[in-house]
Amino acid sequence: MNENEFQFVMDCDVESLVSFLQDDYQLPLSEAFEKVYSSKTFEKLKDRKTGLYLQSPAYIYTFLMEEIRGQHKND
C-alpha cells in the first residue's frame, strides 16, 4: 500500500470513528474529532506496524470505546 492509499484508508477510518461518536454520544463534530485525534487508539491506527488500519472501522471503534470508558472510570 502506498502512502496515498494509506492516507485514504486513515481518512475513511477517522471519518467513521467520528460519525460513530456523534451517533452514540451526540457530540459536536469538533469534539468528536478531538476525541479521535487525541486517543491512544489513533496513535495505534496511524502506526502501520500495528495493522489496525486494515481492520473495519467498527472493530477499531471497539478499542476507542474501551479507551474512552477507561478514562471516565478515572474521573
What function would you assign to each model-found segment?
Residues 1-75:
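C-terminal alpha-helical interaction appendages
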